[in-house]
Amino acid sequence: MIWHVQNENFILDSTRIFMKAFHLLLFHGSFIFPECILIFGLILLLMIDSTSDQKDRPWFYFISSTSLVMSITALLFRWKEEPIISFSGNFQTNNFNEIFQFLILLCSTLCIPLSVEYIECTEMAITEFLLFVLTATLGGMFLCGANDLITIFVAPECFSLCSYLLSGYTKRDVRSNEATTKYLLMGGASSSILVHGFSWLYGSSGGEIELQEIVNGLINTQMYNSPGISIALISITVGIGFKLSPAPFHQWTPDVYEGSPTPVVAFLSVTSKVAASASATRIFDIPFYFSSNEWHLLLEILAILSMILGNLIAITQTSMKRMLAYSSIGQIGYVIIGIIVGDSNDGYASMITYMLFYISMNLGTFARIVSFGLRTGTDNIRDYAGLYTKDPFLALSSALCLLSLGGLPPLAGFFGKLHLFWCGWQAGLYFLVSIGLLTSVVSIYYYLKIIKLLMTGRNQEITPHVRNYRRSPLRSNNSIEWSMTVCVIASTIPGISMNPILAIAQDTLF
């Protein structure tokens, strides 16, 4: 009898929850229509996986890619609409958030073709991989539009949990298991510190959780200059620092980059930074409006440490993925300059433009690593010597992406850095910009060193890996080359047409 009563209560509670969720989607679903498309794609993937066999693998890629492209299309159709706050203040839709959501969707769309051949060669479970990628993308999109402390915590946890699972996807690889363990432990620790900072904000504002209401609460309680706000600022900076991975919060980055499957690293290297940058700008700009001098100083220290340590340590690396890990630490230092400048002097517009270029440069380089690694099984920089003699397209595309990452004209990376540094200079960040210029010169050195190896034709320097190198006959090879071609074009052509891209970003934001 008791069991029947409990069972009926469970059914009633479940029905109420379902009806409430349906009610929210019915009246607020139009505000998260791009996210709803991804949710529908996830459900469709699960249904097809449970009713089909392994011969339907192409359908999994098709559904994932189509849902991402449709989500991008839905996002573009509502471009330039009036800002809307929905879900009882938990979610905000505006042009600023939508730009970051577009960048995250673009990352995921380009990463799926990179993964096709890798998944087939390593015989990884395809459905779960794509589910984790789409769910992480969904978490990143919700983080971009999060408008209260609870959503800002839950959304990145959704992204992080999928990231942990993806980084340890090759369970038989010892390095992958080690990377996942470090990633999980440090991620859990950083999340607890982030929540600790949120608790101080919540208490100091008189129990408010919405970002703008927190500012009003701090004014009402006269706590905006209290020690509690300083504790909250430091704790939240540490928590967000783990997601952005600037120095000194970068310890997990090289190990995770080296141990995780290469397509996963490509995905995490861009999406995590885009989502964390969107969250950082909103948190620092709104609740900490009265502490702008303090958080500017904290971010300046992080940017300087990142640019110096990231680029100097990258010189000493022998693994291509570890080198790119330290390079990404240096790159996030440049992005932080845009966060510090903010609305004034086009700081956000230049930051978003540079991140768009960084996505293409970084993913183009990782496409090369995926392709070369599948043919040779190595990640050592020395083993790339003489690749031009065997695969000119791969070597030339790699060289263009690396030169763009280094910031050499007339490539996209040069104009992106130039405008970012110019905005910082106009804002009075002279020391920070000077460090950025010097470390950019340092980065050119180790990028050129790799390009020299790629282009060498001396037989004594060519390794057995390149001598035995052969192109794969797999049809899916075209997907990697397609992604690489798109990324190479995006890393070169926008450099010539920088002004229109920047004008679009400025017009959209302001």
From Swiss-Prot:
Transmembrane segments: 24-44, 59-79, 99-119, 124-144, 149-169, 183-203, 229-249, 295-315, 323-343, 347-367, 395-415, 418-438
Primary location class: plastid
Keyword check for Ribonucleoprotein: no
GO BP: any one term: ATP synthesis coupled electron transport
Enzyme Commission number, as recorded: 7.1.1.-
GO cellular component: chloroplast thylakoid membrane
Signal peptide span: none
Annotated compartments: Plastid, Chloroplast thylakoid membrane
Membrane topology of this protein: Multi-pass membrane protein
Disulfide cross-links: none
Keywords: Chloroplast, Membrane, NAD, NADP, Plastid, Plastoquinone, Quinone, Thylakoid, Translocase, Transmembrane, Transmembrane helix, Transport
Catalysed transformations (reactions): a plastoquinone + NADH + (n+1) H(+)(in) = a plastoquinol + NAD(+) + n H(+)(out); a plastoquinone + NADPH + (n+1) H(+)(in) = a plastoquinol + NADP(+) + n H(+)(out)
GO molecular function: NADH dehydrogenase (ubiquinone) activity; quinone binding
Taxonomic superkingdom: Eukaryota
Assigned protein family: Belongs to the complex I subunit 2 family.
NCBIfam families reported in the protein's UniProt record: NDH_I_N, PRK02504.1
Record text on subunit structure and interactions: NDH is composed of at least 16 different subunits, 5 of which are encoded in the nucleus.
Its biological purpose: NDH shuttles electrons from NAD(P)H:plastoquinone, via FMN and iron-sulfur (Fe-S) centers, to quinones in the photosynthetic chain and possibly in a chloroplast respiratory chain. The immediate electron acceptor for the enzyme in this species is believed to be plastoquinone. Couples the redox reaction to proton translocation, and thus conserves the redox energy in a proton gradient.
Name the UniProt record assigns to this protein: NAD(P)H-quinone oxidoreductase subunit 2, chloroplastic
